[in-house]
Regions:
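Single conserved hydrophobic/aromatic residue that forms the stacking wall/gate
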Residues: 1-11, 351-352
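Aromatic-lined carbohydrate-binding surfaces of glycoside hydrolases
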Residues: 45, 54-59, 64, 68-80, ...
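Short N-terminal segments immediately surrounding and downstream of signal-peptide cleavage
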Residues: 28-43
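Bacterial Sec-dependent N-terminal signal peptides
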Residues: 8-30
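Conserved short beta-strand edge segments in small beta-sheet-based binding/regulatory domains
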Residues: 98-99
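Long, charged amphipathic helices and adjacent flexible linkers at domain junctions
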Residues: 111-116
Length: 353
């Protein structure tokens, strides 16, 4: 479990101070985000729960659960903790399972169990990451908002606070490449079909089952806005993509002096589906990064954490340690030039097929 009831003495003393401070504070306003979640999951019992945000002064996330006046009261230091507390009650007291499938019915007891004593649970770790690039290529390409809404609820219920959020990036890349001189058909043909986009994003394959429809790009852009807004509302920090060096082959025509090379073949795909990479030491790299991140931030906002994997299951143009070190340095510097608070998260699936 991501949360533990074994609080340290320091935590217990801090919690006592918080409880004392609650007695001197005004009544907290109803937590709309959590009420809305209850209405989505089990509307018939929504009125049986109350949620209260506690001062966020402890080192770790925490929640408390208690029965007060025939209601279940859940307190926590943020909405993510409140959601995790709700799931703890559902799982261990109601014996209720909430799946991430929107069509799965949630079976609740007719009478909600009463807690005899108040319980307090502390998170075991601060950052609780979920998803990887490949998961966005199974059924997710065809998900509607209703599907995502349920998954985001599930993530919050299970304590996830750092989800990968890479939907909708092609809409931004479309604008970037078009501004740099590529034609509509070139750009949409450079993308793969929806089911293979994760491997396109990881620089494994281009052009496969393309062109990508403009309508799909627009719908995914709107969907990503809904996704990151809801994730933030529920106390999460979405991990957005940034530029890794993967470029369309056609960019070489417009920028003949750019240090663009072809990546190795991947997964048995024909030569014509190989991807291309621009050296991060080329000045054009930083310009592309800046253009992309500024557009992404304007559209989706930022929490200053970005996912980049430059050589996922493909060969680096050069395996020299100094080259790889310089590539990493230049990639991070290009992000930092746009976002001085940037953090880089990497999956490290650095194996060659």
């Amino acid at each position: 479990p991501l949360y533990s009831s074994a609080a340290s003495d320091v935590y217990k003393r801090q919690l006592l101070l918080l409880i004392i401070s609650f007695g001197c504070s005004p009544v907290f306003a109803e937590n709309r985000a959590m009420k809305d979640m209850c209405n989505r999951l089990f509307p018939e019992h929504s009125g049986n729960f109350t949620f209260e945000l506690a001062p966020d002064s402890l080192e770790n996330d925490f929640f408390t659960i208690e029965s007060i006046n025939d209601k279940i009261k859940i307190s926590g230091n943020n909405n993510n903790s409140l959601a995790t507390g709700l799931n703890h009650y559902l799982k261990y007291y109601c014996h209720t399972h909430v799946s991430w499938y929107a069509t799965d019915k949630i079976e609740m007891p007719r009478q909600l169990p009463v807690l005899l004593d108040k319980i307090t649970i502390f998170a075991k770790c601060k950052t609780r990451f979920f998803l990887n690039y490949c998961t966005f290529g199974y059924s997710m390409p065809y998900w509607k908002w209703k599907d995502w809404e349920r998954l985001i609820d599930w993530m919050a219920l299970n304590g996830v606070n750092t989800p990968l959020a890479i939907t909708g990036q092609e809409a931004i890349w479309y604008d970037v490449w078009k501004e740099m001189g590529l034609k509509d058909q070139e750009i949409r043909s450079y993308f793969t079909g929806p089911a293979h986009l994760p491997w396109h994003r990881m620089s494994n394959v281009d052009y496969w089952q393309s062109p990508l429809p403009l309508s799909w790009l627009k719908n995914q852009r709107k969907l990503q806005k809904q996704i990151v807004d809801r994730e933030r509302l529920l106390g999460m920090t979405p991990v957005l993509p940034a530029f890794s060096g993967h470029v369309p082959a056609e960019l070489k025509r417009l920028y003949p002096d750019a240090a663009i090379t072809q990546m190795s073949q991947w997964g048995g795909y024909d030569e014509k589906y190989r991807s291309h990479f621009i050296d991060p030491m080329d000045p054009l790299f930083g310009k592309i990064q800046k253009r992309y991140l500024e557009k992404q931030t304007k559209l989706y906002g930022t929490d200053h954490i970005y996912g980049i994997d430059p050589f996922n299951e493909v060969d680096s143009p050069n395996w020299d340690e100094d080259f790889l070190r310089t590539v990493s340095d230049k990639i991070f510097h290009s992000i930092e030039q746009v976002d001085s608070l940037a953090h880089w998260i990497q999956m490290l699936s650095l194996i060659h097929i």
